[in-house]
Design a protein with these regions (language model features):
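N-terminal metal-binding scaffold of metallo-dependent hydrolase/deaminase domains
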Residues: 1-44, 55-56
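Acidic, glycine-enriched loop/beta-strand segments at the rims
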Residues: 13-25, 280-281, 287, 346-355
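Histidine/acidic-residue-rich catalytic or RNA/ligand-binding cores of hydrolases
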Residues: 219-231, 259-264, 281-290, 307-323
């Protein structure tokens, strides 16, 4: 057969032609799309032929920031800010003492299934607690592509106790054998310390891994850095050579014009989670200004604790509406937001050839 799978008569929407929709077909051979065309693919050419009439066919969505461990906690953080949640759930270590590794395994799998059912085909898992090989198995069994961010700390409540180099080597090997991308989970602003951050940067460089971290997320974390270092988190990282193309900053709600330039100059990546930012009252990120400065912004959902959903389509709508209201009707056009959900996310993980 010419194609393993053929989909005919679908409404095709893709960045390759500026999202100009057309009725057409695609052919897939050995997991790769090898043909995109106007008109039909004949049934006889395909092992499996699917009639896409009335359906939209577009690239899979990318969720660049998610905490699958938190899906079991959906709804428990409603009507609370992140700081209030920190206080409310500190006594259980963010539910650590209430759930076991099996619970976390299935919480992640539920997250990945929800993501797939809403069109997401790549997801970044930001782990609070490592599950070793089970982290890889949870994602591989569901069949979603993704990146796994292993926290650099043995326990995220103890910022100076790092996992070993041998552990990271084995973890990276397990991820790559499963077709997943290994990432190092960094630290948040309340744990900033120059030697600690440079140590994380050096480990990531030695292992050939990207770093993801919560960055400029809210006012209380911003104030911690301001009081400790008399500057902002972004400026602090920039001037200590801790921002580069291997850093993925999540949220980035509080960024001045100068800090946006610093992000752009360093080629750091940004993943914004607009519904999370609204739900826990973090604020409105200056996304239009980031786009204007050439920063490739991606989308994420965060964990269900801070969103109640794993649906990137909802994030696209939220991104559009909040900035239309805040910055004007054409501050972010539809094509730009589609890029955030697809090709920008792919570029974040060096997968642009797949999009």
């Amino acid at each position: 057969m010419k194609y393993d799978v053929g989909i005919s008569n679908a409404i095709i929407v893709s960045s390759h032609n500026g999202y100009e929709p057309f009725i057409g077909s695609i052919g897939v051979k050995e997991t790769r799309i090898t043909c995109v065309m106007h008109g039909e693919i004949e049934k006889e050419e395909c092992e499996i032929w699917i009639d896409g009439t009335g359906k939209i066919l577009m690239p899979g969505l990318v969720n660049g920031h998610c905490h699958g461990d938190m899906t079991l906690a959906r709804g428990l953080g409603d009507d609370m800010t992140l700081l209030e949640q920190n206080h409310a759930f500190a006594d259980t270590g963010w539910f650590y003492t209430l759930i076991n590794d099996e619970d976390r395994f299935y919480s992640r799998q539920l997250t990945y299934c929800e993501a797939l059912l809403s069109g997401t085909t790549f997801i970044m898992e930001n782990m609070y607690w490592g599950l070793g090989k089970e982290s890889v198995r949870a994602m591989k069994e569901v069949g979603i592509r993704g990146a796994l961010a292993e926290d650099i700390r043995i326990d995220f409540m103890r910022p100076d106790e790092f996992v070993s180099g041998e552990f990271l080597d084995e973890y990276k090997k397990q991820c790559e054998e499963a077709g997943l991308i290994p990432v190092i989970g960094g630290i948040s602003e309340e744990d900033y310390e120059t030697k600690r951050l440079k140590r994380i940067r050096d480990i990531a460089g030695q292992k050939g891994m990207m770093i993801t971290c919560h960055l400029a997320e809210n006012t209380w974390r911003r104030e911690i850095v301001q009081q400790r270092y008399q500057t902002s988190a972004i400026d602090y990282l920039y001037h200590n050579n801790l921002l580069d193309e291997n850093v993925i900053g999540s949220h980035v709600v509080y960024a001045t014009g100068e800090e946006i330039h610093q992000l752009a100059q360093s080629n750091a990546k940004v993943v914004n989670t607009p519904l999370c930012e609204m739900k826990i009252c973090d604020g409105i990120a200056p996304i239009p200004e980031m786009v204007q400065n050439g920063i490739r912004v991606c989308l994420g959902t965060d964990g269900a604790m801070w969103n109640n959903s794993n649906d990137i389509f909802r994030e696209m709508k939220g991104m559009s509406l909040i900035h239309t209201m805040n910055s004007g009707i054409r501050s972010l056009d539809t094509k730009t937001i589609l890029d955030m959900a697809t090709v920008n996310g792919a570029m974040c993980f060096d997968l642009e050839k797949d999009y």
